[in-house]
From Swiss-Prot:
Main location: mitochondrion
Source organism of this protein record: Micruroides euryxanthus
Transmembrane annotation, as ranges: 25-45, 69-90, 105-125, 170-190, 218-238, 280-300, 312-332, 339-358
One family name in Pfam for this protein: Cytochrom_B_C
Name the UniProt record assigns to this protein: Cytochrome b
Subcellular location: Mitochondrion inner membrane
Topological category with respect to the lipid bilayer: Multi-pass membrane protein
Names of required cofactors: heme b
A GO MF label: metal ion binding
Amino-acid positions noted as binding heme b b562 in the UniProt annotation, renumbered to this chain: H75, H174
Amino acid sequence: MLNQHTLLISNLLPVGSNISTWWNFGSLLLTCLMLQILTGFFLAIHYTANINLAFSSVIHITRDVPYGWIMQNTHAIGASLFFICIYTHIARGLYYGSYLNKSVWLSGTTLLIILMATAFFGYVLPWGQMSFWAATVITNLLTAIPYLGTTVTTWLWGGFSINDPTLTRFFALHFILPFIIISMSSIHIILLHNEGSNNPLGTNSDIDKIPFHPYHLYKDMTMVSIMIMLLLMVMTFAPNLFNDPENFSKANPLVTPQHIKPEWYFLFAYGILRSIPNKLGGTLALFLSIIILTTTPFTHTSYIQSMAFRPLTQILFWTLIATFTTITWTATKPVETPFIYISQMTSIMYFSFFIMNPLLGWAENKIMMNM
C-alpha cells in the first residue's frame, strides 16, 4: 500500500529537473503556516482577549505555562521567518517571470494581503505600548476614505476609540484568517500544478521532468531542516531580536511612544506611507505598494520570460531590492531632515520599477531585433 502511494506521488507530480533552491520557498511557507497555526492554537488556549488582562496573560504564558516560552517565541519569530520566506518567494517570482502564470500570481498577491492583515491583528494582541499605538495609527488611516471613513473606523473599533471590543474582534480575526489562508493556499497550489512551475531558464519544462519524490522532496526537507535550525538558534540565543522594547510595557493611551513603528516586515509599506505629507495620499500609496504587484503579469513586454538573460533588467531588479531595504531602514528612523528625503526618493524608485520594467523589456526587444 505504501509503495503504491509513493508511486502515485511520483507519477502524478512530475517536476522540471532544473528548478533551483529558489523554488523551495513555497514548501517553507507551508511549513511556517503549519508551525504558526499549531503554536497559535496553544497560545490561544491561555490568552485572554481583554484590555486589562491581555498583557498579563502573555506574561503568564511566558513565565508559568509549561513550555509556554517556546510557544510564544516560536510564534513571534515564526512570523518574521514567514515574511522572510514570502518576500524571497515574491522576489524569485519577479526575477524569473513566474508572474506570467496570471492565476497563480494573483492568488498569491491576495494571499500576501490576507497574511499582512493577519500579522497586523496578531501584533495588537499582546496589548503592549507599540501594539496599542500601531493599532491606533494604522486603523486611523481608514478615516481618510471619503464619506465612509469615520463610519468604517468606528465599526472596526467597536466604539469611538480603541478599547475592549477592538481587542476582542482583532483576536477573532487573527484566529479565523489563518484558515482562510489555508483555503487560499490550496487554491494557489492547485492553480500552480494545473500548468506546472516555470524554471530558471524560463523555458518549457515538459521535455525534461523528474518525479517530485524522492528528488525534490529531499531537497525540500533539507531547506525545512535549515529553516527550523535557524528558528531554534534565534529562539535560544536572541529571542527578542525582532521585538520592540516599547512592547514590554503595558499599553497606556496617555503616553505616546517617541517613535511609533510596526513590525519590521511592514516597514517598507509604512516608510512609503510616511514619505507622503498627506493622509489620503499616504494611505493610497500604502495600499498601492502591495496592490501594484498585480500589474506585473499585464505589463510584461520582453520576449524572454526570465531575467537570467536580461542584464539591464537585472540591474533594475537589484535596484528594487536595495530600494526595499533602504525604505525599511528609513522607516525605523524619526521623521526628520535626511530621512524624509531618503524615504521620498526611495518611494519614487520603488514605484518606478513597475514603470521601468516594461519599458526596459521593450527596449531589450528592439536591441535583440537589431542584432
